[in-house]
C-alpha cells in the first residue's frame, strides 16, 4: 500500500512520535510505502511531499514540533480545494491518508472522507478538547510545562508580594488551566466554561492577603471571560482563518485586580512554550499507539474513522462523532478544584 501522512494546525508535542510509529508499522511490518506532505493540507493541495522511510524518522521520537511542518490551510479554504486534493491522491496512487491534527484538521478530514477519500485520522491537541477520546497527546506535556512555570512563579510572586495572573492555552476549554492550577496549588482558576464574577474573584484573592499571605497566583485559560457586565472587557477579534484572537485575559484581569485590591498585579503569558519542546513519556507512548493503530485501520479498510483512547484501549470512532462537540470541563471537575484552591 501507499500511505500519505500530514500534520495540520498548531504544532504539538508528540507529532513526530506518531509519524515515526506510522512509518515503522507500515514500512517495516507491512512493507508499505509512506510519503509525508509538507505543511499539512497545504502540501497535499500543492503536491509537495517527501519520502518517509526508517532513516527519515530516526531520532525524532523525543523531538518536539513536526518534521513535516504544519499550517492552518484547509481544503475548504479554496474553491477547488477538495477536487484538487482528490486529484493529487489519485495522481500519487495513494491508498490512504492519515491526517494528524485537532478540531479543524479533523473537520477537514471528515470533509475529505465524505468526498470519497480514504481517510484515517489521528487526534492531537494540547487543549484535550476532543470529545471522543479520553486524552489527546500533547496535553500531558503542556500541563507539565505550565505546572513547572507556576511552581517557579510562586517564589517571585512571594518575594514582591504580588498577584500574578498566569495565562495558559485553552481557547474554548479550560483543561490545561484546571490541571496545572490543581497540580501547582494555584489560588484561583478561571476557565471558558464558567464565566467568572470579578467581585467573587477579588474577594477570594483579597482574603489571602488578609490572612497574612504575601502573594496569590491566578491561572486563567486564554478563552476565560467575566460574567457579562461585571467588568470592562475587550473580546478581541478573529484571525484570517476565523479563529478567535483573544485580547489578553491575563493583562485585563491583572489591571482590574490591582485597582480593586491595591496590590501590585502582573500578567504572565506562557504562550507557545506550552506546546514546544520534547514530549513527556506519556505523550510519546500515546502518540506511538495512535500511529500503530492508524496503520492497522488502513489495512482493515476502516476509513472515515479516527483513533481514540478509551480507558487503556485504542479504539476507532467515526470522524463524524469527533467533530460534533468539544469536550468541556464539567461543573463537578471545577468543583473538585475549587475545594483545594
Give the location of each predicted region.
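N-terminal phosphate-binding or glycine-rich loops at protein starts, especially the Walker A/P-loop
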Residues: 1-45
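Accessory alpha-helical/coil subdomains and C-terminal extensions
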Residues: 88, 96-101, 111, 139-157, ...
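Glycine-rich oxoanion-binding loops at beta->alpha junctions
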Residues: 44-99, 104-105, 137-144, 148-149
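Short Gly/Thr/Asp-enriched flexible loops that form oxyanion-binding sites at enzyme active sites
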Residues: 17-22, 103-117, 177
Amino acid at each position: 500500500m501507499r500511505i500519505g501522512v500530514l500534520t495540520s494546525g498548531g504544532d504539538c508535542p508528540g507529532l513526530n512520535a506518531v509519524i515515526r510509529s506510522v512509518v515503522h508499522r507500515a514500512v517495516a511490518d507491512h512493507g508499505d510505502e509512506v510519503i509525508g506532505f509538507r505543511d499539512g493540507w497545504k502540501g497535499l493541495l500543492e503536491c509537495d511531499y517527501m519520502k518517509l522511510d526508517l532513516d527519515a524518522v530516526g531520532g525524532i521520537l523525543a523531538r518536539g514540533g513536526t518534521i513535516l511542518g504544519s499550517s492552518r490551510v484547509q481544503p475548504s479554504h479554496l474553491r477547488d480545494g477538495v477536487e484538487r486534493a482528490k486529484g493529487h491522491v489519485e495522481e500519487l496512487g495513494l491508498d490512504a491518508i492519515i491526517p494528524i491534527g485537532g478540531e479543524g484538521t479533523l473537520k477537514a478530514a471528515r470533509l475529505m472522507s465524505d468526498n470519497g477519500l480514504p481517510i484515517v485520522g489521528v487526534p492531537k491537541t494540547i487543549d484535550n478538547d476532543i470529545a471522543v477520546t479520553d486524552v489527546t497527546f500533547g496535553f500531558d506535556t503542556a500541563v507539565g510545562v505550565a505546572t513547572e512555570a507556576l511552581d517557579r512563579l510562586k517564589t517571585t510572586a512571594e518575594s514582591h508580594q504580588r498577584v500574578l495572573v498566569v495565562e495558559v492555552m485553552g481557547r474554548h476549554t479550560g483543561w490545561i488551566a484546571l490541571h496545572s492550577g490543581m497540580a501547582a496549588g494555584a489560588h484561583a482558576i478561571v476557565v471558558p466554561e464558567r464565566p467568572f464574577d470579578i467581585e467573587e474573584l477579588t474577594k477570594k484573592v483579597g482574603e489571602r492577603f488578609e490572612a497574612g499571605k504575601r502573594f496569590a497566583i491566578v491561572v486563567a485559560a486564554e478563552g476565560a471571560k467575566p460574567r457579562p457586565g461585571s467588568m470592562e472587557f475587550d473580546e478581541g477579534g478573529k484571525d484570517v482563518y476565523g479563529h478567535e484572537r483573544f485580547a489578553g485575559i491575563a493583562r485585563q484581569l491583572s489591571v482590574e485586580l490591582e485597582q480593586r485590591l491595591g496590590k501590585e498585579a502582573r500578567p504572565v503569558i506562557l504562550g507557545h512554550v506550552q506546546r514546544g519542546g520534547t514530549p513527556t513519556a506519556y505523550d510519546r507512548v500515546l502518540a506511538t499507539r495512535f500511529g500503530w493503530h492508524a496503520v492497522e485501520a488502513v489495512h482493515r479498510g476502516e476509513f472515515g474513522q479516527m483513533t481514540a483512547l478509551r480507558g487503556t484501549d485504542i479504539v476507532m470512532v467515526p470522524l463524524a462523532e469527533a467533530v460534533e462537540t468539544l469536550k468541556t470541563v464539567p461543573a463537578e471537575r471545577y468543583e473538585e478544584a475549587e475545594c483545594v484552591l
